[in-house]
Swiss-Prot record:
It comes from the Eukaryota. The chain crosses the membrane at residues 22-42, 72-92, 157-177, 206-226. Residues 381-392 have a biased composition (Low complexity). Proteolytically cleaved by caspase-3 during lens development. Phosphorylated on Ser-364; which inhibits cleavage by caspase-3. It comes from Gallus gallus. Keywords: Cell junction, Cell membrane, Disulfide bond, Gap junction, Membrane, Phosphoprotein, Transmembrane, Transmembrane helix. Structural component of eye lens gap junctions. Gap junctions are dodecameric channels that connect the cytoplasm of adjoining cells. They are formed by the docking of two hexameric hemichannels, one from each cell membrane. Small molecules and ions diffuse from one cell to a neighboring cell via the central pore. It is a multi-pass membrane protein. It is found in: Cell membrane; Cell junction, Gap junction. This is Gap junction alpha-8 protein.
Amino acid sequence: MGDWSFLGNILEQVNEQSTVIGRVWLTVLFIFRILILGTAAELVWGDEQSDFVCNTQQPGCENVCYDEAFPISHIRLWVLQIIFVSTPSLVYFGHAVHHVRMEEKRKEREEAERRQQAEVDEEKLPLAPNQNKGNNPDGTKKFRLEGTLLRTYILHIIFKTLFEVGFIVGQYFLYGFRILPLYRCGRWPCPNLVDCFVSRPTEKTIFIMFMLVVAAVSLFLNLVEISHLILKRIRRALRRPAEEQMGEVPEKPLHAIAVSSIPKAKGYKLLEEEKPVSHYFPLTEVGVEPSPLPSAFNEFEEKIGMGPLEDLSRAFDERLPSYAQAKEPEEEKVKAEEEEEQEEEQQAPQEEPGVKKAEEEVVSDEVEGPSAPAELATDVRSLSRLSKASSRARSDDLTV
């Protein structure tokens, strides 16, 4: 039958990268198929054609009848079955080896980068002894079925299942599941219907049933492995959202921070201080009593409540009303003083004699102040020249 050691060595490596059920399947393949096929089955079918005897002397009739009874030998059919069933495993093994090599190269690159980083860290800060022994020095490979490797594994199981079913169905249509001791043949060049006899029919039937049971067990293991992987994938997909929900930490609402409670460092200012101030008169902070708001400023406040603050620069003057009104009384006072000075200059030459008399009377009244109580009731003093210019009571009406 030849040497099966090459295929056995490859399948042993596939065994390292399979699931538990896949390893059981490989055990069934090795022990109950390859081993039995290489030892016992060859001896049973060794004399198959030589012991096939027909009751005719017609040349070639016996060979034609054997070809009709056994279009392909059982042993060769089972060898083809083993090869076809093992081919998906070989394809998966090639992909797994490629995946493992790529992972090894990636780990080597990461290890090189880690060593370079460790050397840089040692130059900056030397490590304590036994600190960098956390990594696994053995480099043991932890095999995991995930991603493309898992998909390849499932596909190779599906193809194995299809090949198993195909060979079982093919064997049934070729031979059936029993070997009859008598086979009737009427194929040309046989002169008539010829009786042919098969050697060891019972023993061959037992081997056929045994190999059929092994194929059924292999098919069952394939179906169980596919179901196991699919259920495992579904459970992982259902478990992932629950883990994500458990891993999510509920966010606590951030409380508002009062700006006044934050200590401000010297030379820095808080961004919250740039918000618009709630009052408009900075003089109140110094202790000056604020004056009542003018009508224009009331309109300003009403317009603030009506619209957004962005349009204030367009609707109103940029100057605050308080500062604008603080300058207007000063200008009015200066103008009033200038008008009074002009009136005084015009009336000065006309009122000089009267003013002198009034001043003399005032001086005499002051000298006689305690002795003239009757004159205090009625003030007959003439108005000063400044009092004539304005009707308001002024502090400089009396000259001391």
